[in-house]
Amino acid sequence: MSGNSRFIVSAQDGPHRDLEALVRRHMAHPFRKPIADYNREAFAAAMAAWATFGRKKPLILDAGCGVGWSPLNIAASYPDHFVIGVDQSIDRLSRGKPVELPANAVLIRADLVDFWRLLAENGIHLARHYNLYPNPWPKIGHLARRWQGHAVFPVWRELGGEVECRSNWRIYIEEMAQALSLLSGQSVVAEPYVTELPMTPFEKKYLASGHELWRCRVDLG
């Protein structure tokens, strides 16, 4: 990816005014949509891979891992953890990688909405939970499509672990920080982020294009 990425344009000039009410409503009313069979099969495959590496090893989820570069980097940084990278696109997951997938990582094609709930239903606790450069859905009317505005969002609290979300859209991270504050009861802040070692192709492209990067982090226990 070359450094020619466009800046995000939105009519929003700050966190969505309806975010708090939406998050509180979702916290009060659990998401009940039936889980698709193919996602159950994908979840079983992920659990089998974890068991092969060692079920007692701490688990890291890279939610929306795209072409799979970030799970490689995370696995290298945490060799004593098992990393599950999940993306809904088999095309993205099948693209070439700079190195082979290590023994402590697996890439899974699944819908995150179902995968998160399956983790929670099975009582699985995450050590770390990454959400790197998700689709920002910048239109004002698309709040419920952003993860912080989605009905599945409260499940994150059940999964625990150290959560980190990054984006090149400041407002997205400000919203995520606000939503995570509501979810956790902690003070979560949006902060600028700079790195010389980009974790994903998008992060590399955004840096090369002169974008500001933002992140928020919280420990959900």
List each language-model region with its residue ranges.
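Class I SAM-dependent methyltransferase "Motif I" SAM/SAH-binding loop
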Residues: G64-G68
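Conserved SAM/SAH-binding beta-strand->alpha-helix loop
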Residues: S89
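Class I S-adenosyl-L-methionine
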Residues: Y172-A179, L183-G221
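Charged helix-capping and loop-helix junction motifs
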Residues: A144-V152
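S-adenosyl-L-methionine
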Residues: M1-L59, W69-A76, P98-G123
